[in-house]
A protein has these predicted regions:
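Transmembrane helical elements of multi-pass membrane transporters/channels
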Residues: 18-37, 140, 151, 174, ...
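Small-residue hotspots at the loop-to-helix junctions and early N-terminal turns
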Residues: 45-59, 134, 138, 197, ...
Length: 449
């Protein structure tokens, strides 16, 4: 028991790193898992197939994943708080409610998504030459949606109780399988985009089964029992109270990016391929910063539940410093190796040139996001989710949307699109700093407010 709760006891920087590294390594393998599709189709099928899986499809998949990662964070925060408070009864009720929620929503979203795929792609002005492959990929993806949501829920629960290692082991194994399946189905069996979609969904199914098995075999404090998977209304309300604002935040974020993708789609196939591939490459940066965000959410949640307010506040400061150091190193490395990284995905010289220019333009501004990622994670762990959601929706999403409809028609071009990112990050970062200093708990009495 003591070993599993070092988050509330150990040296902060050391425990943050112990918790962070499995998350960031796991996120790296998740990115490899996703990127393998693009590399295989880009090099063995063609740039049209690369654009199909990297453009509108990537934005739609990201929207769905981000929404449900947001909802799973509701379960994660509540479970972390109950675990820190050693309230095992409510911990287990939340665990079983979360799994019931994942199964039901996975089935519903899969059915709806399959039905509206083509309509959404048309609404996004997906180029006609990319439509067939995009529809095939998304239809197969939606057939396996339940696996995706169950895995994310299970992994989120494990991290909430301080176990960031076993989700990593699952990802490493399924990542290797995904690459193997990609090569077999695309390179040897010539199945194209259908092959990478089948490979992805198959591995998501394996991931979901493995993380569920881990929870079934877990210790008695938070063991999943299949017969007890049901909705406990009080637990569901607590999960949704945290999860819905986070999911709405993620939804608005991705809707803004979907709108941006529509404008990018009008700039030609090469730009679409470069933009979509950029999202694969710079994910290396986001996985580092967001892993610190996940870590601080769990740290704050458990210490909040245990009533250790000063330790909770100190962990935020330590996490910010560590995040900035890592963010600067990663963005500098990506900047320096922009062209070689693009050549991993495609041999088309024009796509490489456009993509490298994108990276050189945007990467110097990425440091501004660190404050947003860490402070929003900390506030979430303390149960403050509504205002951070409004800050993100207004400061990031609405500004980007207004920018695209107000500025882009006057100064059209990819650089105008890219400029919306640093502008929105800068404004939102200032808003988060102000709110954090005003509302983040300073005393135990504020926990009860």
């Amino acid at each position: 028991m003591e070993q599993k709760n070092q988050i509330t006891e150990g040296v902060i920087w050391k425990q943050l790193l112990i918790f962070f590294f499995p998350i960031v390594i796991g996120t790296f393998f998740q990115q490899v898992y996703n990127t393998a599709d693009s590399i295989v189709v880009g090099r063995f099928v063609g740039k049209e197939a690369l654009a199909a899986v990297s453009g509108s499809v990537n934005q739609i998949v990201t929207l769905i994943v981000e929404v449900f990662v947001g909802l799973t964070s509701g379960a994660s925060v509540i479970i972390a708080q109950f675990y820190g408070a050693k309230d095992h009864k409510n911990l287990n009720r939340t665990l079983h409610t979360a799994y019931a929620f994942a199964i039901v929503t996975g089935a519903i979203v899969g059915l709806i998504g399959f039905w509206i795929t083509e309509k959404v792609l048309i609404a996004m002005k997906t180029p006609s030459e990319l439509m067939a492959d995009s529809v095939i990929y998304l239809h197969i993806y939606f057939c396996g949606m339940i696996f995706n949501i169950v895995y994310n829920m299970g992994a989120s629960i494990l991290r909430a109780v301080g176990d960031s290692r076993r989700p990593l082991y699952v990802l490493i194994m399924t990542c290797g399988l995904n690459i193997f399946f990609d090569i077999m189905l695309v390179v040897f069996l010539k199945m194209g985009v259908m092959g990478v979609a089948i490979a992805t969904v198959s591995c998501q199914g394996i991931s979901a089964c493995m993380v569920t098995w881990i929870l079934i075999k877990g210790n008695s404090l938070f063991r999943l029992k299949i017969r007890e998977i049901r909705f406990y209304m009080a637990s569901l309300q607590s999960v949704l109270r945290i999860g819905i604002p986070v999911a709405l935040e993620a939804t608005m974020y991705t809707i803004a990016n979907l709108i941006i993708q529509i404008f990018v789609n009008g700039l030609g196939t090469d730009t679409v391929a470069a933009w979509g591939t950029f999202a694969k490459i710079d994910a290396i940066y986001w996985m580092v910063v967001n892993s610190f965000g996940i870590a601080i959410t769990t740290f704050v949640g458990q210490n909040y539940g245990a009533g250790k307010i000063q330790r909770m506040r100190k962990s935020v400061k330590v996490c910010l410093l560590m995040s900035y150091g890592a963010a600067i190193l990663v963005s500098a490395a990506l900047y320096g190796f922009a062209e070689p990284l693009y050549r991993l995905f495609t041999t088309d010289s024009n796509v490489v040139r456009i993509g490298a220019d994108m990276m050189h333009f945007l990467l110097p501004s990425y440091f501004m996001y660190v404050v947003i990622g860490i402070l929003s994670g900390a506030l979430r762990g303390a149960g403050r989710v509504l205002v951070p959601m409004l800050l993100t929706c207004g400061g990031v999403c609405l500004i980007r949307i207004a920018w695209m409809f107000g500025v882009f028609p006057v100064y059209s071009g990819i650089k105008t699109i890219m400029l919306s990112y640093p502008v929105s990050w800068g404004i939102t970062a200032v808003l988060f700093i102000i709110y954090y200093f005003k509302k983040f708990p300073k005393t135990e009495e504020q926990i009860l407010q």
